[in-house]
Swiss-Prot record:
InterPro entries: Autophagy-rel_prot_9 (IPR007241). Residues 539-559, 724-744 dip into the membrane without crossing it. The chain crosses the membrane at residues 319-339, 377-397, 621-641, 657-677. Changing residue 392 to A: In Entrance 3 mutant; impaired autophagy possibly caused by mislocalization. Residues 1-318, 398-538, 560-620, 678-723, 745-997 are cytoplasmic. This is Autophagy-related protein 9. There is a cross-link at residues 113, 121, 138, 701 (Glycyl lysine isopeptide (Lys-Gly) (interchain with G-Cter in ubiquitin)). Forms a homotrimer with a solvated central pore, which is connected laterally to the cytosol through the cavity within each protomer. Acts as a lipid scramblase that uses its central pore to function: the central pore opens laterally to accommodate lipid headgroups, thereby enabling lipid flipping and redistribution of lipids added to the outer leaflet of ATG9-containing vesicles, thereby enabling growth into autophagosomes. Changing residue 576 to A: In Basic mutant; impaired autophagy. It comes from Saccharomyces cerevisiae (strain ATCC 204508 / S288c). Changing residue 969 to A: Abolished autophagy and cytoplasm to vacuole transport (Cvt) vesicle formation. Phosphorylated by ATG1; phosphorylation is required for autophagy and cytoplasm to vacuole transport (Cvt) vesicle formation. Phosphorylation by ATG1 regulates ATG18 interaction and preautophagosome elongation. Phosphorylation at Ser-122 is required for selective autophagy by regulating anterograde trafficking and interaction with ATG23 and ATG27. Phosphorylation at Ser-122 prevents ubiquitination by the SCF(MET30) complex. Ubiquitinated by the SCF(MET30) complex in normal conditions, leading to its degradation by the proteasome, thereby preventing inappropriate induction of autophagy. Ubiquitination by the SCF(MET30) complex is prevented by phosphorylation at Ser-122.
C-alpha cells in the first residue's frame, strides 16, 4: 500500500539524513520513520525584526517557526511525467499569496491531498503575511538586482555573495516549475535533445516508487530519439536523466562497442541505512567506508568545488597516480635546490685540474662553513616551504581517499579504469546517482543537485575558465610595455598565473561565485580602483621574488632540456603552441583533457603546414655556419692525432682548451645541419590549414584566399612558435612581468570590470556564469542568426553513430570580422557545435589517451593519400603515373577520377580505364557519379578537390580545362590526354638544363 507523500509537518527535531539521500519516493526505508521527515527540513530562522516577516495575525505568531518547513527538493528525474509531480510538490508548499493575505483559504479541494496542500499553505503564510511580496527558496546565487531589493534583510547565516531567498511574483507559481533553464532560453538543438532524450523512470532502481512501472515500460519502447530522417539516432544521452539506456540504436544494431568496452553499472546504494539517520558529523568515522562515502555525498555543501575535485581526480588517473605525482614534484623541487646549492658551495673547482678523486675537491662541512648569512636564511625558508607542502600532502591524501571511495562505492568506477574510461561515462554515473534521489544537506544546492547533466557539470567545472576564454579572445588586456621590443602583447605562463591570481581571485569569492559588487554598475569605480591596486601589489611582489624564480627556472629548464638537445640536436627546431594560442583555440565548456588531446593531435599537421614553405635564406645561412664549424672541428681533430694526450688540454684561449671548442663547435654544427630542410614537400597550404582547422578550430576570415602567402605563415607561427623561443620568453617574463603588472594592466582594470558585468548571465541553480557558455541563441543579434531554424541548425550539428562533423559543416562557423560581438557569437556557436559533437557522438567516447575509431578507406592499391615526401626517381620511374603527384591532398589511383572538380571511389576500374585511354574527363566524372546510391554497402566517398592557392587573387578563376592543363603537361586543351604518356613527360623533363644539379 502506497504511503501518503504529503503529511503534516511535526515538531520532532530529528536529523533527517534519509531525506537527503532518498527524498520523497523511497519505499525501502525503515517504516518507523515518518514520511514527512523524509521530505522536509527546518527553515533557518530569519530575523523577526524585519517588517517583511511580521504577521498581522497574533495567533500565528505563537506558533514556533522552527516547525515551518519547505520541500527540500522536487524529486524529479528530469522526465516530463515526473516534472508534473514536481509541479504538484512545489505548489503544495508554495505560499498562495492571493488567498493568504485576505485570510481566505478556500480552495477547490476534492481530495484529501488537496486539503493537505491548504494546510501547508497556511503554515507558510505565517512567514510572509503582511507584506506585498513573498519569498521562496531560490537555488544558487542571487542576481544583483534582486540582492539590492533585499539588502535590508539580515541573514547572518548565509554568505552575502550567495543569498538564499528571492522575491517572486504570484504568477510564477501558477506556471510549471523546472530545475533547468526554461526551454525558451535553451538553444534550438538543446531543446531538441532535451525533448527527445527525456529519460524514462527506471523501474529497477533502488528506493523508488513502483507506481508507474507499466506506464514507463510502455512509453520507453516508443520514445527513442530520432534524427531528421526519422530513423533512430545512434547517440548518447547526457542531457537529463541517466536511468535510460545509454545508447539508442536501430533495431538492426542493438549492440554497441562502447557498451561492451565500458559497461555501465548503476550505483549500488545500501538497502538498509537506517543506522545513518542519526549519525552526526563528528561520528562519521564510526561508519563503514561505503556508508561514509554516501554520507559525504549527501552533505555536499558546494557542488562546484565537489565536481571540480571529481574531475581533477579523473584527470589525475586515480588515487595512486595523483599521490605519486605530488611526491615526485616535491622530490624534483628538493633535487634542484640541493644539487644547485651543493655544486655552488661544496665543490672546490680550483682543484679539478690536479685532482683524480671526488673526495679531493669536496669542501668539508660546507653547510656550516661555506653557506652563511643570506643564503642560509633562504635555505631555511625553503625547508619551511617543503614542510608546508608535506603537510598539505597529508590533507590531500585524506581528501583523495574520500574521492576514491566515492568513485569506487557510489559510481562503481575503480582507479584502474580511469585511464581508459571516457569522461562521459563518469557523467552518466553521476546522473544515475542523482536519479536515485541523493540530495545535499545544503538548501542552496538542493535543486542544483538535480541539475546534473553534461552541460551543467561542464559549466560548474569551468566557471572560471569560461570567463578566461572570453577574456583572452576579447583582446581587452594590455600586456605590452612602452619600450622597444616589448610593444606587442605577449602572454607567458608567468603572466597568465598572475592574471589569474589578480583578476579571478578578485572577481570570485571563496564559494566560487562571482561577487555581487562586480555586477553592480554603481560600484564600478570602486571595483576598478581595487583591481588596479591589486595589479600594482602583485607587481611589487614579483619584483621581490624575481631573482629566486629566475634562478630556479633556469636550473629546472637546464636539467630538463639539456640532455634532449644534446642527444637530438634537431629537436631545437621543435615547435609548440603559445599560451595565448591555447586560450584562443579552446572552446567554451571544453574540459581540459578533451582540449589537450585535440591540440596534441594537431601538431603533426601544424608542422606540415610550416615545413611546406621554403626557407632558402635560412638554409643558406645554416649551410655556411655548419661549414665553418665543421672545418674548425676537423682541424682540431686532425691535430689531436699527433699528440692526443697533451693537445686535448692545450688552451686555445684563456682557460679554454681544445676539448671545450670541439664540444661547442660540434654542437653548433649538429644543430645547424639538422635544421636545414632537404626534403621535398607537396605545397598545398590551403588544404593543410583546413585540415588543421579540424583540430585547432581557428581559421580567421582574414586568412581566406591568402593561405599560401608568407605573412599568413608568420601569423600562424606567432601562435605555433619554436619551443626554445617560448622558453626564453618565459625566462624573460620573470623580469618583465612586474612592470606589466605595474604599468600596463592597471589601465585595463575598468574594461575588465565592464567585461564581467556585461558577460555574466544568471541561471537558476548555477548562479552567474559566462553567457557564452550557456549557448543561448537568443543572445545573438543579426538576421543570419535569427533566420536559423531548428532544422537547419540540426543539419549542421547532428551526428550519427559513425560519422563526425566534417570540414564543410565546421567551416561554416569560421569567425567573421564584422564586429567584436560577431566574433564572440561565432565563437559561441562553434563551441556549441563541438560540445554537442563531444557528448552526442558515440565515436568520440574514448579515454584521455585514446583516439576515436575512424572508418578508414579501403586498403586497396591506389587508395592511399598522397605522400608528403617523395623523390624524383620515384616519381619518374618506369610505369609510374605523374597524376599521382599532382597538387592536392588526394592521390589519383585506380580508385579515383582525375577530374579536379569531383571524383568518387565508386566504380574505380571504369573511371581509371576511361581516363587512361584518353576519354573525355567530364564523361569519366559523370560515369563515376551517376550511380549515387546511398544503400550501397561499399565505402563510397566523394570529395571536392581544393586547390592550394589557385583561388587567390593571382589566379581568380580556373575551369576544368585550366586545371588539367596545369596539372598534366600532356593535356592538349580539348579534354584529351596525349598518347605520349609517361615517356613523353620524361623526355620533356630531361630537356631542361638544370636536371641533375
Amino acid at each position: 500500500m502506497e504511503r501518503d507523500e504529503y503529511q503534516l509537518p511535526n515538531s520532532h527535531g530529528k536529523n533527517t539524513f534519509l531525506s537527503r539521500i532518498f527524498g520523497l519516493q523511497s519505499d525501502e526505508v525503515n517504516p518507523s520513520l515518518n514520511s514527512q521527515e523524509m521530505s522536509n527540513f527546518p527553515l533557518p530562522d530569519i530575523e523577526r525584526g524585519s517588517s517583511l516577516l511580521h504577521s498581522t495575525n497574533d495567533s500565528r505568531e505563537d506558533v514556533d517557526e522552527n516547525d515551518l518547513r519547505v520541500p527540500e527538493s522536487d524529486q524529479g528525474t528530469s522526465t516530463e511525467e515526473e516534472d508534473e509531480v514536481d509541479e504538484e510538490q512545489v505548489q503544495a508548499y508554495a505560499p498562495q499569496i492571493s488567498d493568504g493575505l485576505d485570510g481566505d483559504h478556500q480552495l477547490n479541494s476534492v481530495t484529501s491531498k488537496e486539503n493537505v496542500l491548504e494546510t501547508e499553505k497556511s503554515n507558510l503564510e505565517r512567514l510572509v503575511e503582511g507584506s506585498t511580496d513573498d519569498s521562496v527558496p531560490k537555488v544558487g546565487q542571487l542576481s544583483s538586482e534582486e540582492e539590492e531589493d533585499n539588502e535590508f534583510i539580515n541573514n547572518d547565516g548565509f554568505d552575502d555573495d550567495t543569498p538564499l531567498f528571492q522575491k517572486s511574483k504570484i504568477h510564477e507559481f501558477s506556471s510549471k516549475k523546472s530545475n533547468t533553464i526554461e526551454d525558451g532560453k535553451r538553444p534550438l538543438f538543446f531543446r531538441h535533445i532535451l525533448q527527445n532524450n527525456r529519460p524514462q523512470r527506471d523501474t529497477q532502481k533502488l528506493f523508488t516508487s513502483s507506481n508507474a512501472i507499466h506506464h514507463d515500460k510502455d512509453k520507453s519502447a516508443n520514445n527513442g530519439p530520432r534524427n531528421i530522417n526519422g530513423n533512430q539516432k545512434h547517440g548518447t544521452k547526457y542531457f537529463g536523466s541517466a536511468t535510460q539506456p545509454r545508447f539508442t540504436g536501430s533495431p538492426l544494431n542493438n549492440t554497441n562497442r562502447f557498451t561492451k568496452l565500458f559497461p555501465l553499472r548503476k550505483p549500488n546504494l545500501l538497502s538498509n541505512i537506517s543506522v545513518l539517520n542519526n549519525t552526526p558529523e563528528d561520528r562519521i568515522n564510526t561508519l563503514s567506508v561505503k556508508e561514509r562515502a554516501l554520507w559525504k555525498w549527501a552533505n555536499v555543501e558546494n557542488l562546484d568545488i565537489f565536481l571540480q575535485d571529481v574531475y581533477n581526480y579523473y584527470l589525475g588517473n586515480g588515487f595512486y597516480c595523483i599521490i605519486l605525482e605530488k611526491i615526485l614534484n616535491i622530490c624534483t623541487l628538493l633535487f634542484v635546490v640541493f644539487v644547485s646549492t651543493y655544486m655552488g658551495h661544496c665543490v672546490d673547482y680550483s682543484k679539478l685540474p690536479t685532482s683524480h678523486r671526488v673526495s679531493d675537491i669536496i669542501i668539508d662541512k660546507c653547510y656550516s662553513n661555506s653557506i652563511t648569512g643570506f643564503t642560509k636564511f633562504f635555505l631555511w625558508m625553503f625547508y619551511f616551504f617543503v614542510i608546508l607542502k608535506i603537510v598539505q600532502l597529508y590533507f590531500d591524501v585524506q581528501k583523495l581517499s574520500e574521492l576514491q571511495n566515492f568513485y569506487k562505492y557510489l559510481l562503481n568506477i575503480s582507479d584502474d579504469e580511469l585511464q581508459t574510461l571516457p569522461w562521459q561515462n563518469v557523467i552518466q554515473q553521476l546522473m544515475y546517482l542523482k536519479d536515485q534521489n541523493a540530495m545535499t544537506a545544503n538548501v542552496v544546492e538542493v535543486k542544483a543537485k538535480n541539475r546534473i547533466d553534461a552541460h551543467d557539470v561542464a559549466n560548474r567545472i569551468m566557471r572560471r575558465e569560461n570567463y578566461l576564454i572570453a577574456l583572452y579572445n576579447s583582446d581587452i588586456l594590455n600586456l605590452s610595455l612602452p619600450i622597444p621590443l616589448f610593444r606587442t602583447n605577449v602572454l607567458t605562463k608567468t603572466l597568465e598565473w598572475n592574471i589569474n591570481l589578480c583578476v579571478m581571485g578578485f572577481v570570485f569569492n571563496e564559494s566560487g561565485f562571482i561577487k555581487q559588487s562586480i555586477l553592480k554598475p554603481s560600484q564600478r569605480e570602486f571595483t576598478r580602483e581595487e583591481l588596479q591596486k591589486r595589479f600594482m601589489l602583485a607587481g611589487f611582489l614579483n619584483i621581490i621574488l624575481a631573482p629566486f624564480l629566475v634562478t630556479y627556472f633556469v636550473l629546472l629548464y637546464f636539467f630538463r632540456y639539456f640532455n634532449e638537445y644534446k642527444t637530438s640536436p634537431g629537436s631545437i627546431g621543435a615547435r609548440q603552441y603559445t599560451p595565448i594560442a591555447e586560450w584562443k583555440f579552446r572552446e567554451y565548456n571544453e574540459l581540459y583533457h578533451i582540449f589537450k588531446k585535440r591540440i596534441s593531435l594537431s601538431t603533426t599537421l601544424a608542422n606540415k603546414y610550416v615545413d611546406q614553405f621554403p626557407k632558402e635564406k635560412t638554409n643558406l645561412f645554416l649551410k655556411f655556419v655548419s661549414f665553418i664549424c665543421g672545418s674548425f672541428v676537423a682541424i682540431l681533430a686532425f691535430l689531436t692525432v699527433f699528440d692526443p694526450e697533451n693537445f686535448l688540454n692545450f688552451e686555445i684561449t684563456s682557460d679554454r682548451s681544445v676539448i671545450f671548442y670541439i664540444t661547442i663547435l660540434g654542437a653548433i654544427w649538429s644543430v645547424s645541419r639538422n635544421t636545414i630542410t632537404q626534403e621535398y614537400h607537396v605545397f598545398d597550404p590551403e588544404e593543410t590549414l583546413k585540415e588543421l582547422y579540424e583540430y585547432t578550430h581557428y581559421l580567421p576570415k582574414e586568412w581566406e584566399g591568402r593561405y599560401h602567402k608568407e605573412e599568413i605563415k608568420l601569423e600562424f607561427c606567432k601562435l605555433y612558435n619554436l619551443r626554445i623561443v617560448i622558453l626564453l620568453r618565459e625566462l624573460t617574463s620573470l623580469m618583465i612581468t612586474p612592470f606589466v603588472l605595474w604599468f600596463s594592466l592597471p589601465s585595463s582594470a575598468g574594461r575588465i570590470v565592464d567585461f564581467f558585468r556585461e558577460n555574466s548571465e544568471y541561471v537558476d541553480g548555477l548562479g552567474y556564469v559566462c553567457k557564452y557558455a550557456m549557448f543561448n541563441m537568443k543572445n545573438i543579434d543579426g538576421e543570419d542568426t535569427h533566420s536559423m531554424d531548428e532544422d537547419s541548425l540540426t543539419k549542421k550539428i547532428a551526428v550519427n553513430g559513425s560519422h563526425t562533423l566534417n570540414s564543410k559543416r565546421r567551416s561554416k562557423f569560421t569567425a567573421e570580422d564584422h564586429s567584436d560581438k560577431d566574433l564572440a557569437n561565432n565563437k559561441m556557436l562553434q563551441s556549441y557545435v563541438y560540445f554537442m559533437d563531444d557528448y552526442s557522438n558515440s565515436e568520440n567516447l574514448t579515454g584521455k589517451y585514446q583516439l576515436p575509431a575512424k572508418k578508414g578507406y579501403p586498403n586497396n592499391e591506389g587508395d592511399s593519400f598522397l605522400n608528403n615526401k617523395y623523390s624524383w626517381r620515384k616519381q619518374f620511374q618506369p610505369g609510374q603515373k605523374p597524376e599521382l603527384f599532382r597538387i592536392g591532398k588526394h592521390a589519383l589511383g585506380p580508385g579515383h577520377n582525375i577530374s579536379p572538380a569531383i571524383y568518387s571511389t565508386r566504380n574505380p576500374g571504369k573511371n581509371w580505364d576511361n581516363n587512361n585511354n584518353g576519354d573525355d574527363i567530364k564523361n569519366g566524372t559523370n560515369n563515376a557519379t551517376a550511380k549515387n546510391d546511398d544503400n550501397n554497402g561499399n565505402n563510397d566517398h566523394e570529395y571536392v578537390l581544393t586547390e592550394s592557392f589557385l583561388d587567390s587573387g593571382a589566379f581568380p578563376n580556373h575551369d576544368v580545362i585550366d586545371h588539367n592543363k596545369m596539372l598534366n603537361s600532356n593535356y592538349n586543351g580539348n579534354g584529351i590526354l596525349n598518347k605520349g604518356g609517361v615517356l613523353g613527360l620524361v623526355k620533356e623533363y630531361y630537356k631542361k638544363s638544370d636536371v641533375g644539379r
